[in-house]
Amino acid sequence: MIGKQATLRDIVLEELVQPIDLHCHEELTEEVEEAVVEEEPEYTPYKIIVVCGGCETQLKLYVLATDFGIRSFQASLLENVKLVCPACREDIRNGRR
């Protein structure tokens, strides 16, 4: 290069520009690999007490659920799901209700 400004004639490319895979030379450390692995959700035991949808008998239900799971189940029970006791189930099965 002669002078204060470079000209196209002064620039010499030694290597051709080629596309490369940006992930080709990367290695993940063990810490990063562990962080990438999804953590198993934490399940908490719950005792649910609800009345039968047929005869108003008290029912107890024991479940293991995540925080999101128990809230979704609660919303279902409050809105559009009714649990029934074994006696009411038989009545429904036999066409009595």
Swiss-Prot record:
Q: Does the keyword Methyltransferase apply?
A: no
Keywords, alphabetical? Activator, DNA-binding, Early protein, G1/S host cell cycle checkpoint dysregulation by virus, Host cytoplasm, Host nucleus, Host-virus interaction, Inhibition of host innate immune response by virus, Inhibition of host interferon signaling pathway by virus, Interferon antiviral system evasion, Metal-binding, Modulation of host cell cycle by virus, Oncogene, Transcription, Transcription regulation, Viral immunoevasion, Zinc, Zinc-finger
- Tell me if DNA-binding is a UniProt keyword of this record: yes
| SUPFAM superfamilies membership | E7 C-terminal domain-like
Regarding how it is modified after translation, the entry says: Highly phosphorylated.
**Molecular function terms in GO for this entry?**
DNA binding; DNA-binding transcription factor activity; protein domain specific binding; zinc ion binding
Q: Pfam families this protein is in? A: E7 (PF00527)
Renumbered zinc finger spans (unnamed): 52-88
Q: Which InterPro entries match?
A: Papilloma_E7
Where are the annotated segments for E7 terminal domain? 1-40
* This protein's GO CC annotations: host cell cytoplasm; host cell nucleus
Subunit field text: Homodimer. Homooligomer. Interacts with host RB1; this interaction induces dissociation of RB1-E2F1 complex thereby disrupting RB1 activity. Interacts with host EP300; this interaction represses EP300 transcriptional activity. Interacts with protein E2; this interaction inhibits E7 oncogenic activity. Interacts with host TMEM173/STING; this interaction impairs the ability of TMEM173/STING to sense cytosolic DNA and promote the production of type I interferon (IFN-alpha and IFN-beta).
**In UniProt terms, what function does this protein have?**
Plays a role in viral genome replication by driving entry of quiescent cells into the cell cycle. Stimulation of progression from G1 to S phase allows the virus to efficiently use the cellular DNA replicating machinery to achieve viral genome replication. E7 protein has both transforming and trans-activating activities. Induces the disassembly of the E2F1 transcription factor from RB1, with subsequent transcriptional activation of E2F1-regulated S-phase genes. Interferes with host histone deacetylation mediated by HDAC1 and HDAC2, leading to transcription activation.
Q: What is this protein called?
A: Protein E7
Origin organism is Human papillomavirus 23
